[in-house]
């Protein structure tokens, strides 16, 4: 299908094709040279060089990596924030493509190279095309989306949300067909919380379990009872919540009941109410196991980014702009949610926000996110660029009223 811009941007069509080819090349360059969270020094240099090639020289860099550029069209007007995350993952790239990662053990396996390229492409298009927007525009290249603690709070501390009316973000998704865009209101990403537990007991001989506390058996009880809380006490339609235990370790010997056992799990949810309710019930289970079996259980939780909640009015405005200005050019769905986390949730906590999903699925066995064969087709870059360049000229502060 031939894609076009809204009538107001028709004169930009030919220029866009030239910019698009450069953005695709830039994405491949980023993919070849991935860097881990908080180490994106060369990535930041590459972003700055790309922007400078389009005459964008004022780059705000309050931290060692990442930063943002501002486009001021009207003094005193608020900003629209467009976020692109820039970090990669500690995964060996196993793909056979010309732009395969050249950094051993590091790969853009979550599509952040695409996000960065699209964000940079929007900035380049606005600059080169002389596009004027009703609100000011801030394009953020954010480091360290992946780890705990994540990069979004650092950017917020540095002032990236100053005078921002609302924020837009994106994420490629291999479960959504290429060319499809998800504009889903409400929660779209869960909060991820790491649960670390250390069981300590007297230990003993495996032939006399009645004389000691069997930590492996007690850990299995905790796992079963915890799953019971999640799947029998929570109405998933009201409180989406997931719990998965992923690691258990007790290295003593085949005939030794261990003195120490480590258990790790992941809790995912979308609301503070559900989180507090789970913590209360979970701590009660721990106390019961401790008192009944004369053991000690140390519980440490590491909370990741808050859940991402898309502002319903902003989502509706984006849908209406697309339907009005470029009907039939984008296939839009409105009911796609992910149990994964994203630190875009920190922005969504403070300003009305929308995290847009860009489909990249081209076959049934599409490699998933965070895998060594993950890749995104170059066509998604055009979809992302056209989407943001279509909606930004029509986004007004009034959409939230």
Predicted regions and their residues:
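Metal-dependent amide/peptide-bond hydrolase catalytic core
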Residues: 2-5, 220-401
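Acidic/His- and Gly-rich active-site-bordering loop/insert found
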Residues: 2-108, 113, 117-133
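Divalent metal-coordination and catalytic microenvironments
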Residues: 30, 82, 112, 139, ...
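Active-site pocket-shaping loop/turn-to-helix segments
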Residues: 33, 210-217, 273-278
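Active-site beta-loop-alpha junctions enriched in small/polar residues
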Residues: 35, 85-87, 144-146, 173, ...
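Histidine/acidic-residue-rich, glycine-tolerant segments that coordinate divalent metal ions
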Residues: 68, 89-91, 96-107, 113-114, ...
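Structural motif
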Residues: 78-81, 137-138, 165-168, 243, ...
């Amino acid at each position: 299908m031939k894609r076009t811009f809204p009538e107001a941007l028709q004169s930009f069509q030919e220029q866009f094709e030239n910019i698009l080819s450069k953005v695709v090349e830039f994405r491949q360059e980023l993919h070849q040279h991935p860097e881990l969270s908080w180490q994106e020094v060369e990535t930041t240099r590459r972003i700055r060089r790309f922007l400078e090639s389009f005459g964008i020289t004022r780059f705000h860099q309050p931290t060692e990596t990442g930063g943002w550029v501002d486009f001021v069209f009207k003094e005193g007007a608020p900003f629209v924030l467009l976020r692109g995350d820039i970090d990669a993952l500690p995964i060996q790239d196993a793909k056979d493509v010309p732009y395969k990662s050249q950094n051993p053990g590091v790969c853009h396996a979550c599509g952040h190279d695409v996000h960065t390229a699209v964000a940079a492409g929007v900035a380049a298009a606005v600059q080169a095309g002389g596009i004027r927007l009703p609100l000011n525009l801030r394009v953020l290249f954010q480091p360290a989306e992946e780890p705990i603690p994540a990069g979004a709070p650092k950017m917020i501390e540095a002032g990236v949300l100053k005078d921002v009316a609302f924020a837009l973000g994106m994420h490629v998704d291999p479960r959504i067909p290429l060319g499809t865009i998800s504009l889903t209101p409400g929660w779209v990403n869960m909060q991820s919380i790491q649960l670390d537990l250390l069981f300590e007991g007297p230990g003993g001989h495996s032939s006399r379990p009645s004389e000691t506390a069997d930590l492996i058996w007690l850990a299995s009880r905790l796992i079963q009872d915890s799953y019971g809380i999640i799947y029998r006490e929570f109405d998933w339609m009201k409180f989406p919540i997931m719990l998965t235990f992923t690691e258990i370790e007790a290295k003593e010997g085949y005939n030794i009941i261990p003195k120490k056992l480590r258990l790790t799990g992941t809790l995912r949810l979308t609301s503070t109410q559900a989180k507090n309710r789970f913590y209360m019930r979970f701590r009660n289970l721990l106390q019961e196991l401790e008192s009944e079996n004369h053991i000690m259980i140390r519980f440490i939780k590491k909370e990741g980014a808050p859940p991402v909640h898309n502002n319903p009015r902003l989502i509706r405005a984006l849908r209406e702009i697309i339907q009005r200005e470029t009907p039939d050019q984008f296939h839009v769905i409105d009911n796609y949610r992910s149990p994964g986390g994203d630190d875009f949730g920190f922005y969504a906590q403070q300003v009305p926000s929308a995290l847009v999903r860009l489909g990249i699925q081209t076959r049934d066995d599409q490699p998933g996110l965070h895998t060594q064969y993950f890749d995104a087709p170059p066509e998604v870059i055009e979809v992302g660029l056209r989407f943001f360049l279509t909606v930004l000229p029509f986004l007004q502060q009034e959409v939230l009223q």
